[in-house]
């Protein structure tokens, strides 16, 4: 009797899951048909839109990460999302200040406040192994320290007399020394877990420190990319793997959410490797639908399901993070056609919530709390870094 009920329950749940994913997929398929009659053109956010998006993030950052705040709420899903909401907002503010000098002072103030929140216990605490309040660089996690160091570098660029300069030097120095003595070549995000994309953030931060101060820390990035080229590419695709063990041996295959993330930060210290990985990512993990291009979480797999924390829900193997990060890569690397395709795809999946002064986002069809992470990520993704220019690319076979 119990076995029969359990079997009935499994069949029912399977049917409900299939129905749910069909409901998710149907609007996308209809949109593809409608969109196929027009040609994509990348359109950066307008100034009024940017103002509202910045206003929302400024309010969230100003409220801090204490109980009852949006940052605390997003952190209930995973503490990483609180940190990323702050760090990617800072990267976006820095990009915007590079385009609009009139925003520079405000960007500096917002970045300073974001760093203050990132140093607070609710954000910092989940990443600590050992911690001394006077020296945040004793935190073990490269995930936390990498983003903190890059945020500090952004503040130093925006405010040359940054009050955080000593901390920036301390954190960058600690990271550099750890990379020098790490046999695996990649530092830990958590105990026993070494993800390549988390390390690319820290290495981008070290390269940025070198540009700002003349330090030798960019050498760590050069050593890392040399090893990545030799040891951390998949034999069949050439794509960088996602994770290595304590000896530096690959332990997890290439994944769209990891690649998309890593390529953007790679471009900050090795433009050649970033461009190569971007082309391979597009070739092996994406499908061209004319005016849309969609990226899979795992090359060659078309699974539909709940996915995991990094991928989120999968529809025929395609994931939201893989496509969001691919948009950022396309904008940063100047691939205007692909940026337009991905911008349109992202627009199909997001629901805009707008007031007279603010703008934030939700997810269509499913109830998935994403604010303020979605706002920070999309603002970062849609704004080219300083010196980048979104430009048309020559036509390519299979583009």
What are these regions (language model features)?
Residues 2, 8-9:
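Intrinsic-disorder-associated, low-complexity terminal segments enriched in Asp/Asn/His/Tyr and depleted
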Residues 9-29:
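N-terminal Sec-pathway targeting helices
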Residues 29-38:
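Hydrophobic alpha-helical membrane-insertion segments, chiefly the h-region
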Residues 40-51, 96-112, 155-169, 210-223, ...:
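Structural helix-adjacent loops and short alpha-helical linkers that scaffold large soluble proteins
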Residues 42-55, 59-82, 123-128, 136, ...:
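CBM-like carbohydrate-recognition segments
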Residues 79-81, 85-87, 92-200, 383:
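Extended ligand-binding groove/face enriched in aromatic
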Residues 81-97, 140-156, 194-210, 250-269, ...:
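Well-ordered alpha-helical segments within folded domains of soluble proteins
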Residues 143, 182, 193-321, 334:
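Extended ligand-binding clefts on enzyme/binding-domain cores
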